[in-house]
C-alpha cells in the first residue's frame, strides 16, 4: 500500500486522537489491506508530529511479547514503538489520567534496559544486547490505545505507536551480568492485592531476546538503538486495567521495586 497521503492522514488522525484523548475505529476496519510496514510509517508520521510539538525520543519499546498478552489482545506477534520524554514519570509518581491524556490505560510489569552502546540490526543477538546494556530495572509501562475498546489488530497497534501511554522505571539499577534475567520473578499488586506475576522467560524466552528482536526489526528500517536510550522489553504478565485511585506496586527478584498511582 504505502500511499504517502494515506500514511500522513492516518498519522494525523492518531496524533489528534492522542492530543484530544479520544478513540478511533480500528484503522484496519476501513483499510484491511494495510500492512505492518504501512503501520510503522503511520507511527513515524505521528512521532514526527509529537517531535514538532517539542517531545524528544528517549527510547523504544517492544510489546505483545508474552503469550498471555497475545491471547488477551488476540494479536499474535510483537509490536514496537518509540518512547518520548513526555511519557516518563518518576518512580512512585501520582499520574493524572487527564493531564497524561490516558483513555483506557492498562498496567504492564516489565524489565527496562538502559543502553551504554549503540546497536543496529540485522544480526543483533541476545549476547550483543547484554554486552551493550549498562543496567536493567523494574518498569511499569502503562499502555493505552487510541483504538475503540482495544479492538486492535497488529497493524492498528503498530500504527498507534505500540499503544504507548506512560512509563516509570524503578530507582534501583542492576548490572544484567549479575542476574539470570530469564528466571527473574516479578510480582505485581493493585491496591495491595495480587494482580499478576511472571518470569523473565515469559518474554520470548529471555527479555534480551525480545530486545534483540526489536533491534533487528527496527534495523530493517534503518533505525538504530543509541547509547543512553531505554528499551522496554515487554510485559511479564497479563495487562491490568488502571483507573483513578489505583496504585500499582511491583517487585522483581534481584532488581528491586517500582510503583505508580493514578488520579483523575
From Swiss-Prot:
Instruction: Show the InterPro entries listed in the entry.
Output: Fumarylacetoacetase-like_C, Fumarylacetoacetase_C_sf, Hydratase-Decarb/MhpD_sf
Q: Which residues cross the membrane?
A: none
Question: Which keywords are on file for this protein?
Answer: Lipid degradation, Lipid metabolism, Lyase, Steroid metabolism
Q: Which GO terms fall under molecular function for this chain's record?
A: 2-hydroxyhexa-2,4-dienoate hydratase activity; 2-oxopent-4-enoate hydratase activity
Instruction: Provide the GO biological process annotations.
Output: steroid catabolic process
Catalytic EC class: lyase
Give the EC number(s) under which this enzyme is classified. Answer: 4.2.1.132
Q: Of which family is this protein a member?
A: Belongs to the hydratase/decarboxylase family.
Q: What does this protein do?
A: Involved in the catatabolism of testosterone. Catalyzes the hydration of 2-hydroxyhexa-2,4-dienoic acid to 4-hydroxy-2-oxohexanoic acid.
Please report the name of this protein according to its UniProt entry: 2-hydroxyhexa-2,4-dienoate hydratase
- The scientific name of the source species is Comamonas testosteroni (Pseudomonas testosteroni)
Q: Which gene encodes it?
A: tesE
Amino acid at each position: 500500500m504505502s500511499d504517502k497521503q494515506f500514511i500522513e492522514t492516518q498519522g494525523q488522525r492518531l496524533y489528534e486522537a492522542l492530543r484530544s484523548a479520544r478513540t478511533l475505529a480500528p484503522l484496519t476496519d476501513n483499510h484491511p489491506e494495510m500492512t505492518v510496514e504501512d503501520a510503522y510509517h503511520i507511527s513515524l508520521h505521528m512521532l514526527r508530529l509529537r517531535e514538532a510539538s517539542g517531545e524528544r525520543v528517549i527510547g523504544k519499546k517492544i510489546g505483545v511479547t508474552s503469550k498471555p498478552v497475545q491471547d488477551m489482545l488476540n494479536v499474535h506477534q510483537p509490536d514496537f514503538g518509540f518512547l518520548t520524554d513526555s511519557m516518563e514519570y518518576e518512580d512512585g509518581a501520582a499520574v493524572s489520567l487527564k493531564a497524561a491524556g490516558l483513555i483506557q490505560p492498562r498496567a504492564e510489569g516489565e524489565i527496562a534496559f538502559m543502553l551504554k552502546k549503540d546497536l543496529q540490526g540485522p544480526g543483533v543477538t541476545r549476547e550483543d544486547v547484554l554486552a551493550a546494556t549498562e543496567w536493567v530495572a523494574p518498569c511499569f509501562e502503562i499502555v493505552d490505545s487510541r483504538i475503540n475498546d482495544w479492538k486492535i489488530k497488529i497493524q492498528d497497534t503498530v500504527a498507534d505507536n505500540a499503544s504507548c501511554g506512560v512509563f516509570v522505571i524503578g530507582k534501583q539499577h542492576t548490572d544484567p551480568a549479575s542476574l539470570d534475567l530469564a528466571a527473574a520473578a516479578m510480582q505485581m499488586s493493585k491496591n495491595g492485592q495480587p494482580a499478576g506475576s511472571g518470569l523473565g522467560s515469559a518474554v520470548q524466552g529471555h527479555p534480551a531476546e525480545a530486545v534483540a528482536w526489536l533491534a533487528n526489526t527496527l534495523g530493517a528500517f534503518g533505525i538504530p538503538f543509541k547509547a543512553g536510550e531505554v528499551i522496554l522489553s515487554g510485559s511479564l504478565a497479563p495487562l491490568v486495567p488502571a483507573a483513578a485511585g489505583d496504585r500499582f506496586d511491583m517487585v522483581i527478584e534481584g532488581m528491586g521495586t517500582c510503583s505508580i498511582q493514578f488520579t483523575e
